[in-house]
Amino acid sequence: MALQDFTPSEPLTLGVELELQLLSTHDFDLAPQAEDLLRETAKHSGAWDIKPEITRSMIEIGSSIQRRHGPLREELRDMRNQLTRAARKLNIAIAGGGTHAYQHWSEQQIFPAERFRYISELYGYLAKQFTVFGQHVHVGCPDGDQALWLLHALSRYVPHFIALSASSPYVQGQDTGFDSARLNSVFAFPLSGRAPFVRSWEEFGGFFDKMTATGVVQSMKDFYWDIRPKPEFGTIELRVCDTPLSVDKAAALACYLQCICRQLREEKPFEPSEDDYLVYTFNRFQACRFGLDGEIVDPKTKQRSRLRDDILRTLTRLDEHALDLEALDATQLLRDSLFEGNDARWLRTQRAAMLPLPAVVEAAARRWGE
């Protein structure tokens, strides 16, 4: 199949998707009750969306198209409140976090939908191991060429979003040593990582045609890239964030991306190049492993800096854009988190207080509902 045309959309509009954990209130392990929750929320109010994910212990919610931080945050709060009320009726809880702390992949059940069955048959046990939970942020672009320019310009900021959102230190009952262990599950897929360095939608169409001709991919959904174009929506989609423990953090991350995109579009501080990816994998690993304490290398200057410091400098450069976009509350929340620590640190702090892991997950569910 040919690559579809890129649908023009209003620049810098936002859409947020959150993958969420469904928890048993008995032991706070994952609960395979997605179908029940989908039925319970079928008549929800609001323009947002709820749909199943690859296994039956998770769901995905998606915002409507938003332009500013305040309305986005309020919509996410409304989504949270309606979901929490529906979950209570089913004796389940909902939580953020990039991984469940002690679930075992072999116990997960593939959601009965054609695409999920296809993924399970193709990837085997990796499909069940993909019971991990991420935040995806869409940013509107006027055409495919500008979408690809922005996609590559954003590559150096990918570690920012990994470290700020990181909330997955525990896997199958063990502290992995990573702030974001979730992304290790994504790395296992053969079409993950970075998009190819092409600059025009026509050239990207040629790449897509070659890939479909091999039979390796059937649609854009088969690419698990960190940032990918979404032509039917007219967006690029950032996919590296763990689902935060709160909707306020999710809204702040989305608006941080919006501010960066505005600065890149208006100021064009550099021109993206293939060499931007020389240190991409190293920087990505540092953010996953060490979070805000990681070190990154600037692809232009080759200088190393602490990731926390680089984010702080970026936030300072974005002040004017955040003011114009009415996102100062969002950027302040992220500034505070640079000193308070990310959600991975919060989860480890709960564990350090001698809480058993089920109690840590219960605390995360309470935090989600606040």
Curated annotation (Swiss-Prot):
GO terms for molecular function: ATP binding; glutamate-cysteine ligase activity. Its EC number is 6.3.2.2. InterPro entries: GCL_type2/YbdK_subfam, GCS2, Gln_synth/guanido_kin_cat_dom, YbdK. Keywords: ATP-binding, Ligase, Nucleotide-binding. It is an enzyme of class 6 (ligase). One of its GO terms (biological process) is modified amino acid biosynthetic process. It catalyses: L-cysteine + L-glutamate + ATP = gamma-L-glutamyl-L-cysteine + ADP + phosphate + H(+). Belongs to the glutamate--cysteine ligase type 2 family. YbdK subfamily. PANTHER family: GLUTAMATE--CYSTEINE LIGASE 2-RELATED. NCBIfam families: gshA_cyan_rel (TIGR02050), PRK13516.1 (NF010040). ATP-dependent carboxylate-amine ligase which exhibits weak glutamate--cysteine ligase activity. This is Putative glutamate--cysteine ligase 2. It comes from Methylibium petroleiphilum (strain ATCC BAA-1232 / LMG 22953 / PM1). The lineage of its organism: Bacteria, Pseudomonadati, Pseudomonadota, Betaproteobacteria, Burkholderiales.
